[in-house]
Amino acid sequence: SFNYKTFFKLAAKSNDDVKKAFFVIDQDKSGFIEEDELKLFLQNFSAGARALTAGETKTFLAAGDSDGDGMIGVDEFQALVKA
């Protein structure tokens, strides 16, 4: 199963890298990562990667959505990655 904490530990984590990753995942350029974008998270980094399961997506969203609006903003994403 997918573990976002392990993924981020393996990835470079400078502030610039984190922001670049955020904007890659934010496919519709809304300034937020929504649930449908989060589901396809791994595919942004590897073309043949699987989609996250509904449970993995919900867990990831809950971990990153500190204000409870159902989306992950750039500041929330940075806090999640740096955790």
Swiss-Prot record:
Function statement: In muscle, parvalbumin is thought to be involved in relaxation after contraction. It binds two calcium ions.
PANTHER family attached to this UniProt entry: PARVALBUMIN, PARVALBUMIN ALPHA
Family to which this protein belongs: Belongs to the parvalbumin family.
Protein's organism: Macruronus novaezelandiae (Blue grenadier)
Keywords: Allergen, Calcium, Metal-binding, Muscle protein, Repeat
One GO cellular component term noted in the UniProt record for this chain: cytoplasm
Domain of life, per lineage: Eukaryota
Molecular function in Gene Ontology: calcium ion binding
Annotated binding of Ca(2+) 2, by residue: 65, 67, 69, 71, 76
Residues that, per the record, bind Ca(2+) 1: 26, 28, 30, 32, 34, 37
EF-hand domain span: 13-48, 52-83
Stored SMART domains: EFh
Remarks, miscellaneous: Is regarded as an important allergen. On the 2D-gel the determined pI of this protein is: 3.75, its MW is: 11.35 kDa.
Signal peptide from the UniProt entry: none
Name this polypeptide is given: Parvalbumin beta 3
